[in-house]
Amino acid sequence: MAGTVLQVVESLGGWRLLDDGQPIFWFPERDSALETAKVMADARHQFDGKPTCVQAQDELGAFELVFAFG
């Protein structure tokens, strides 16, 4: 069963939320982007039962797993 990956990446002085690589939202603060991504990931997992995770860039630009559902 394929899952969904939401990613929070630095962009234009703020943070962009990517949905399977496609940009969907931009936030001025990282925490706002992470909270929105967490709610979206949890809702998707609740709705379709597929695994969903949130990854975010760290200070060096590498991705770290922040949340996982399913």
Can you say where each PLM-predicted feature lies in the sequence?
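Short aromatic-glycine-(Arg/Gly/Cys) micro-motifs in beta-strand/loop hairpins
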Residues: 1-23
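Charged, amphipathic alpha-helical segments
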Residues: 2, 29-42
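Generic marker of residues within folded, mature protein domains
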Residues: 7, 44-46
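A generic structural signal for ordered secondary structure
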Residues: 13-15, 36, 55
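A short, exposed loop/beta-hairpin motif centered on an aromatic-Gly-Thr core
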Residues: 20-32
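Short, mixed-charge low-complexity intrinsically disordered segments
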Residues: 46-70
